[in-house]
Amino acid sequence: KSALKIDPNQQRVEFSDGSLKYDHLVLSTGSKPRELPPYNSRKIKNLFTMRDLNDANSIEAFMKSGMRLLIVGGGYIGLEAAATARKFGVDVTLVEIEERILKRVAAKETSDYIRSLHISNGVKIKEAIGLDKLEIVGEKVVNASLTDGSDINVDFVIVGIGITPNTDLAEGANLKINNGILINEKCQTSVSNIYAAGDCTSFKYKNTLVRLESVGNAIDQATTVAQNIMKQNTSYTPKPWFWSDQYDLKLQIAGLNTGYDEVVVRKGESRQVSHWYYKGQSLLAVDALNDPRCYMIGKRLIEANKSPSKNQLRDENFNLKVLLK
């Protein structure tokens, strides 16, 4: 059943069929995918968003070899969907309104690598071009008009334009909200016996307010919440890490690149490469592409607040492991 309202003063959650008292309350309300206004994917049979296993199963059951797919959004969700669709023999066009794919989350070097990978696998990528409108016949999309004036005949559309944290319950309880439910280092909201964890939360990381959309963050915050409810007085220390699998590429990311002013490229063997984000002389994050060794070293350096010199990174013969001692 669904919770309808939280009463922090009475420490009570209301449901359609009654209510429940609490001593401690945990909000792990997650997030929902952004829709394409004015289109509602629940009413259009071949318009999909991607958020959970049910979405993935619905898309997989629908697509067949030779179908024409339009993906709206060049973030990780859209790109992973493109890679999967190509494995099924689907004809894929991806549009991204920004000047390059992954602009919000990655450096140009990472965007360039992944763009080339997709093009080599037959994906048509259109950057700085957005969706103008969809032509709906009955309950299906049949055509898409793009902002460059072109039209694409489509068999189905996947929308990957980000997510919105589910904060309605928290807002109704007058908890503090800022791009998510605000929490402190104990994962407490603005009401001390109400906690929150996962995609729905925002918090301070290196003096910047962030919201992390990752499995690791959700697990770590949930652990912190449980420990504090059990009076273990635990503080949550964010250790951001992410990954993305596309074709034979494994991209692993450690840290957050917010505010970077330089990217150092370290080449490895064959198709291995890593991109290291710096602000001044401080290491912020690393994107490791098919390079798990650099990912693990970078992750440990960031967590230890250590920064190799940029020349050390550029030197392919320099053993980064010595920096971990």
Residue ranges and their predicted role:
Residues 29-88:
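Glycine-rich dinucleotide-binding loop and its adjacent helix/turn
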Residues 76-133, 214-215, 238-243:
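Rossmann-like dinucleotide-binding cores of NAD(P)H-dependent redox enzymes
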Residues 20-32, 72, 152-162, 222, ...:
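Short hydrophobic core segments
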Residues 292-311:
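A short, polar/charged loop-to-alpha-helix boundary motif
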Residues 1-11, 127-140:
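A conserved short coil-to-beta-strand element within the FAD-binding core of flavoproteins
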Residues 59, 307-325:
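Cysteine/selenocysteine-centered motifs that mediate thiol-based redox chemistry or coordinate metal-sulfur cofactors
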Residues 200-296:
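Mid-to-C-terminal Rossmann-like scaffold of FAD/NAD(P)H-dependent oxidoreductases
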Residues 43-65, 138-145, 150-224:
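FAD-site-proximal beta/loop scaffold in flavoenzymes
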